[in-house]
């Protein structure tokens, strides 16, 4: 069996639970045809570089797959039919990456930076309030 990285973009109107349902549907297709789904990264709702079918945002999902070519062909066929899928892309790879993708690492880093920013702002506000009280 070959190793693949597969990414799909789901419409912005779709609820996050429906994205998970789409993912489980395509996992079922892969497993039915004798493949295995590895790591799954849901990047959430992100802006698109350009509009696709009147959508400015989409849910991004990255999946590592170990499956025969027939399983990939069937999954892509079903994605073509589904109106909730805006785009998909499957790439054959030599090996799967063990660590998180660069995009997910970037999202995590930004999330932590946002928390640090909030922490650094709150003492400043407290100091400013304390200074106002003293005067």
Curated annotation (Swiss-Prot):
GO terms for biological process: translation. It holds the Pfam family Ribosomal_S6. Residues 99-135 are annotated as: Disordered. Gene3D superfamilies: 3.30.70.60. GO terms for molecular function: small ribosomal subunit rRNA binding; structural constituent of ribosome. The keyword RNA-binding applies. InterPro entries: Ribosomal_bS6, Ribosomal_bS6_sf, Ribosomal_S6_plastid/chlpt, Transl_elong_EF1B/ribsomal_bS6. Keywords: Ribonucleoprotein, Ribosomal protein, RNA-binding, rRNA-binding. Signal peptide: none annotated. The keyword Nucleus does not apply. Transmembrane segments: none annotated. GO terms for cellular component: cytosolic small ribosomal subunit. PANTHER family: MITOCHONDRIAL 28S RIBOSOMAL PROTEIN S6, SMALL RIBOSOMAL SUBUNIT PROTEIN BS6M. NCBIfam families: S6 (TIGR00166). Belongs to the bacterial ribosomal protein bS6 family. Binds together with bS18 to 16S ribosomal RNA. This is Small ribosomal subunit protein bS6. It comes from Bartonella tribocorum (strain CIP 105476 / IBS 506). The gene is rpsF.
């Amino acid at each position: 069996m070959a190793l693949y990285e597969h990414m799909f973009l789901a419409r912005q109107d779709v609820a996050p639970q429906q994205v998970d349902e789409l993912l489980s549907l395509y996992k079922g297709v892969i497993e039915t045809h004798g493949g295995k789904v590895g790591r799954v990264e849901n990047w959430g709702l992100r802006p698109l570089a350009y509009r696709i079918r009147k959508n400015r945002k989409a849910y991004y999902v990255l999946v590592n797959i170990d499956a025969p070519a027939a399983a990939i062909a069937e999954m892509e066929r079903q994605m073509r039919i589904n109106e909730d899928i805006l785009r998909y892309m499957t790439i054959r790879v030599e090996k799967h990456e063990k660590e998180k993708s660069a995009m997910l690492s970037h999202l995590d880093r930004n999330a932590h930076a946002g928390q640090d920013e909030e922490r650094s702002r709150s003492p400043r506000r407290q100091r400013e309030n304390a200074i106002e009280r003293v005067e």
